[in-house]
Every structure is written in C-alpha cells, then in structure tokens.
C-alpha cells in the first residue's frame, strides 16, 4: 500500500515525500540530489496546498505548527472609514497584500483589526528597536491575556504573538518560517532588500499584510512586494484623509535666492560638474546615472574634481544663509507652537542648535537623552526640535503643528514621512498643520523639491525679508507660554473587527488533511 505523501518544513523550504500522484504540485518543486527529495520554497506553501487539495491529493501536513489564537481586545474603538475599507479590501484579496496609508493614519490599529479578523499566531516585523517597543506596548494593552514577546535588542522570545526587528527576523528566518500564520510587515518598503526578503521567502504564512506610507523604492524593488506580501489592495494620500483621520494641512514652498557670491560660486561648480558629465556621456536623474557618476569619479582627476564640485554645489544650495533668515522668521511667526526643523546633515543640525538655542536630535544622540528630549517636547517644555534623519521613521514623535524642511533628499518617502510628523490630529481640537519647504531658487535643489512634492499641491512663495529692525538687547524672559522673545506676526498665512473568516473562506483555518 502506497504511503501518504508528507509535507514537512526544513529550514526555510518544504519537502514533499513520497511524491504524490498528479501534476498540480510539480511546478512548485525542484529535485534535491543531496536528500533525494523534492523541495519547494516555503513561500509557495499556500499555493501548493491549494493545488494539492484542488487535485484531490491526500497528504499529511507536518509543515505548519501555528495554531488558532483567541484574540479579544481589551478596548474596542470605532475605526475610521478608511481603516474599515482597508481591512475589507485586504480580506477580499485573500488576506494578502499591501496597504498604503500616510503616517499618523492609524496603521497600527488597522494591523490589530487584521489580527482580530485572522486569529492565528502572528509575527510583526518592524525596522527599529523603538518601533518594536511601541508595537509591544500597543499589543500588550490591546491583548492583555495573550502572551506577546520580542525578538531583537537582546530579547529572544518565542511566543504566539512576536514583535521583531527586520534584522533579527532575517537572521532567524529559517527557524521562524513555520511558526506563524500571519505576517505583518510594518514599513514594508524595507522588505525587498537582499538581506530582509528571506523573512517572507522562508515563511509558509498563508496570510500577509504590508503597511507603509510610501512603498516605492529608488532601486525599483518595490515591485517584489507583490510576490513577497501580495498586491497593493488599498491606498490613501494625506490629502484624502485631511480633516478626518488627519489634521488639515498646508504645504508651502519658500524660495530663497542665493547671495551674489554664492550664485557665482554655485554656477562655477555646476559648470565643472556638467562638463565632465558631458565628456563621459552620463546623465544624472536616475539611480543608474548616479552610480555611473560615482564610478567615473574614481577613475580620473577630472572625475574627482567633478564629484567635489557636485558636493560643494549641493552644500551651497542646502546651506545658504538665506535659509537661516527664513528659519528665524518662521520661528517668530509660529511661536509658541511646537515646531520640527529638518535638515539633510548633522553639521547643519548642530549649527542651528547652537545659534538658535534649540535642542538637537541626531543618530549620535544617546537613547536616554533622546527619550528625555522627546518627553520634554511632548509636555511643552521644549517648543522646537531640530533633526536630520533620525525622526523620519521608527520613532514615536509627539504632536507638532509646524514642520520646516531646510534641506532634504529627493526621496518622496522622506518628504511624506516628514509631513506625517505634523498630521496627527490634536487632542485639543482642530488644527492647521503647516509644512514649509525652504529651497534655494534656480539650483538643483529646486528640481529635487519638485520630485519630492509630486504627491502634494503646495503653495509657492518667495521669501521677502522683514524690514530691518533696530538691534535689541538680549533679555531673560519669564517662562510664559503666551509670551515670545521674538516678534510675532499678527497673521499667519471601537468597533470589533469582522468575524474570523480557510484563506479567504468562512474560517481562516489552514486546510485540514
């Protein structure tokens, strides 16, 4: 009597032995001479099982060790319409896919809703330790009766619900692959990298949810998300959620002219760079063009001079003195609102911190000090913070109403993340969130800004400095939230989730054999 085929999990792959009759499974399998067995990538587990079942093939499933997990939230909240719509779209797509929502639009609660609608062992993967601890705190509050653990930062738990960093999940992908039925990838644009993608490829999880504000990647690998997680099933922009889930907001572009000296030097540097690019037939504007420029700059003295000229021209555009005058004016206009200032480099962060007496946050700031600064910003002790990239992602930033981008990259993701830092609705009522993007006029930064703002419709303004004022003596002012040492401008332009629904059927059970 023929033995029943057995499907087993082996370090990120599946082994099906003895080979079953029929042909439905063959397209997934590759013969492995080392073990004399057919081997299938773990990521094809769901498709393989569905193919075997549709072919009427009997088999024993020893691959999965995940199990049902009763999830009852301690507090039920009424979801926003876009959260209910996103959950419904994800369920309709077979509980696989990517949801694109802006920062502060409630992606964490949407994930909780997905967990309640798919009550199985769940792995949540996040990019940073800060985010790992934020998710852990949220889930502990939501599901106090369920064992929740951490993987990363010294923790090595194995629990029904596990929160891990991408690094730790990738390192342990071979052992995690058959333990979880639902994978949730926060900031899922990190997943397609060579190192991280094994988390999805070595997992048999039939249910997958990707969350991000900006799935697009400069290297084009965001296309791999459809294979690793599923198709994009739902998307909303900040503009579509403005005034409902997010605060009303306005994006203002302020153009600053270079000084005569800066302009002459900038034009000279750009001429040097462009002449070299023309000589070697390289066009910037794409990842491939930039990579060719970097390679060519290492091959000759002319290439090195061109690269140095490019860097100096960028420094002039990003750090022109005119931007600092604009910053002083904006700080005056918006005092005592909470303001976040973003720059492209730490040197500018520290210069602004020292000259404007503003707390600074960079990757060099110790964790304890960073938490203390953010706590003081949250309780109003600090009204303003200046930072480079450390607050773009993975840090719980207290509510702010104004963001000033003095310099940035061409990344649409970075722009949307920075905008998201001021979009959280105020607990005190309606607010108008403002994002000012200060760019140097007639420079490459102006073109970069246009790419960054491709998803928004900003107001454009040319900066006009205030009339010169008489010098004022520095004086100590009392700690009064309504008074400002600057001149202030008079006018400044729970509902329970759906009932558990086999993958897409009435019950999210793995198929029984």
Residue ranges with predicted function:
Residues 1-85, 489-499, 506, 511-513:
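Accessory DNA-engaging acidic/polar modules
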Residues 288-364, 370:
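Conserved helicase/translocase motor-coupling segment
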């Amino acid at each position: 009597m023929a033995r029943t085929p057995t499907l087993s999990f082996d370090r990120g792959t599946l082994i099906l032995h003895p080979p079953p009759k029929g042909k439905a499974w063959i397209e997934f399998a590759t013969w492995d001479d080392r073990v004399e067995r057919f081997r299938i990538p773990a990521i094809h587990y769901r498709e393989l099982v569905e193919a075997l079942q549709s072919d009427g093939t009997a088999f024993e499933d020893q691959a999965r060790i995940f199990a049902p997990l009763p999830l009852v939230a301690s507090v039920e909240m009424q979801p926003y319409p876009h959260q209910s719509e996103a959950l419904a779209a994800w369920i309709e797509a077979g509980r696989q896919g990517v949801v694109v929502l802006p920062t502060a639009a409630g992606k964490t609660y949407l994930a909780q809703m997905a967990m309640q609608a798919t009550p199985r062992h769940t792995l949540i993967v996040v990019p940073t330790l800060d985010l790992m601890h934020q998710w852990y705190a949220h889930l502990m509050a939501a599901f106090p009766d369920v064992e929740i653990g951490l993987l990363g930062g010294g923790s090595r738990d194995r629990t029904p619900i596990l929160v891990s960093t991408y690094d730790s999940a990738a390192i342990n992908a071979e052992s995690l692959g058959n333990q979880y039925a639902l994978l949730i990838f926060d900031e899922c644009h990190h997943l397609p990298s060579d190192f991280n993608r094994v988390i999805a490829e070595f997992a048999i999880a039939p249910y997958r949810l990707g969350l991000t504000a900006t799935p697009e990647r400069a290297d084009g690998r965001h296309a791999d998300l459809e294979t690793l997680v599923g198709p994009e099933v739902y998307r909303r922009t900040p503009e579509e959620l403005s005034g409902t889930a997010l605060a009303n907001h306005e994006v203002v572009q302020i153009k600053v002219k270079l000084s005569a000296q800066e302009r002459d030097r900038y034009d000279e540097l750009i001429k040097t760079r462009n002449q070299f690019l023309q000589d070697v037939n390289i066009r910037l504007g794409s990842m491939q063009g930039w990579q060719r420029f970097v390679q060519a700059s290492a091959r000759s003295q002319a290439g090195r001079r061109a690269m140095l000229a490019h860097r100096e021209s960028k420094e002039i555009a990003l750090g022109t003195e005119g931007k600092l005058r604009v910053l002083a004016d904006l700080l005056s206009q918006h005092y005592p609102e909470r303001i976040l200032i973003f720059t492209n480099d730490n040197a500018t962060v520290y210069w602004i911190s020292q000259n404007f007496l503003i707390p600074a946050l960079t990757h060099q700031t110790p964790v304890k000090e960073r938490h203390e600064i953010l706590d003081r910003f949250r309780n109003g002790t600090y009204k303003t913070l200046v930072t480079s990239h450390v607050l773009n992602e993975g840090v719980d930033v207290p509510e702010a109403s104004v963001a000033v981008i003095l310099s940035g990259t061409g990344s649409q993701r970075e722009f949307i993340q920075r905008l998201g830092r001021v979009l959280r609705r105020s607990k005190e009522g309606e607010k108008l969130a403002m994002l000012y993007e200060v760019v140097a006029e007639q420079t490459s930064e102006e073109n970069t800004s246009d790419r960054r703002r491709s998803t928004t419709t900003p107001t454009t303004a040319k900066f006009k400095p205030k009339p010169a004022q008489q010098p004022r003596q520095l004086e100590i002012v009392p700690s009064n939230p309504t008074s400002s040492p600057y001149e202030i401008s008079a006018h400044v332009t729970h509902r329970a989730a759906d009932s558990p629904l086999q993958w897409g059927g009435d019950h999210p059970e793995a198929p029984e054999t």
